[in-house]
């Protein structure tokens, strides 16, 4: 009887260990997915920033066509240009409120 109980306990411990291991592996996968979902911050060159600022000084809202052309000229994605303009408008508004 005692031997049987030991096997059951051992079996439970083994199962718990397996479950914990599976949970741990699942958490590692989730952490890797979360890390991969965040993009690296774009480091704009001085030239790109000068061109973006110059364009912003003329117009704060680019049409899609203008955004595509600017992105191509600066070797950026359309999304990078769009986000830069969004962020720049926020800074512009903050500075002009005070």
From Swiss-Prot:
GO molecular function terms listed in the Swiss-Prot or TrEMBL record: DNA binding; DNA-binding transcription factor activity, RNA polymerase II-specific
Record key words, sorted: DNA-binding, Homeobox, Nucleus
Keyword DNA-binding: yes
Annotated signal peptide: none
Chief localization: nucleus
Localization: Nucleus
InterPro entries: HD, HD_metazoa, Homeobox_CS, Homeobox_TF, Homeodomain-like_sf
DNA-binding region: 37-96
Cysteine disulfide partners in this protein: none
SUPFAM superfamilies associated with the record: Homeodomain-like (SSF46689)
Pfam families reported for this sequence: Homeodomain
Gene Ontology annotations for the cellular component aspect, listed alphabetically: nucleus
Xref: CDD domains: homeodomain
Protein name: Homeobox protein SMOX-4
Organism of provenance: Schistosoma mansoni (Blood fluke)
Species lineage: Eukaryota, Metazoa, Spiralia, Lophotrochozoa, Platyhelminthes
Gene field: SMOX-4
